[in-house]
Amino acid sequence: MFYYTYKITNKINNKIYIGVHSTENLDDGYMGSGKLLKRAQDKYGIENFSKEILEYFDDKESMLEAEKNIVTEEFLNRPDVYNLKLGGEGGWDHVNIPGMLNQKKDASLKGAKSFKSRFENDILLQEKYRKIGSNVFKRLWSTPEYREKFLNNSRFLNKHHTPETINKMKESHAKNNHQKGEKNSQFGMMWIHSLDEKVSKRIKKTDPIPEGWFKGRKMKF
């Protein structure tokens, strides 16, 4: 039996789904089972989705515990995910064993408790799963189109950081020279927009502005 966590990516809009799968056949063609994910696959076509196996595990409990540490409430609040429920809750839609769905669930928490204990006491393991959950977001954030969608998402509009949070952010940014010089995501870049295509994007300041495009960023068309 193979146990693994995986990531499904919509190649058209870069939205993702993180899930788990148990199977005896790694070539079973499994492409996720989330409700929103299935709707998107019907809409865009399964050929426009890619699958990446994140990590293999020795047992189901360790697999679910790993998913729990990736698909958190913070993860679910992101606008670029298809996940609807917290990770680690189990269920049987991820299992691919003939006749398994007709058998009683034989739940053993031994593996999960062992993994949880190891996770809570292993800083390197915590960092590993934190990176899995954040690396995709960082890659998406590097694209102007994603940032615009994220910032305009209704769940994040009219929300403000508390003074305490703002001070913590300032202290953190001061320590790592956040957004200074070449670390600034805008370094050497400029915004241009097209009224015909109704889109804004970044280009290098040294690049010529294409015909029909204008300098500056436009949020609404």
From Swiss-Prot:
PROSITE patterns: GIY_YIG
Family matches, as Gene3D superfamilies: GIY-YIG endonuclease
Gene name, Swiss-Prot/TrEMBL: segB
Family annotation (Pfam families): GIY-YIG
Class of the enzyme per the UniProt entry, highest EC level: hydrolase
Keyword annotations from UniProtKB, A to Z: Endonuclease, Hydrolase, Magnesium, Nuclease
Span of domain GIY-YIG: 1-84
Similarity-based family: To endonucleases of group I introns of fungi and phage.
Cofactor: Mg(2+)
EC number in record: 3.1.-.-
This protein's name: Putative endonuclease segB
Endpoints of the signal sequence: none
Species per Swiss-Prot/TrEMBL record: Enterobacteria phage T4
GO molecular function term, any single one: DNA endonuclease activity
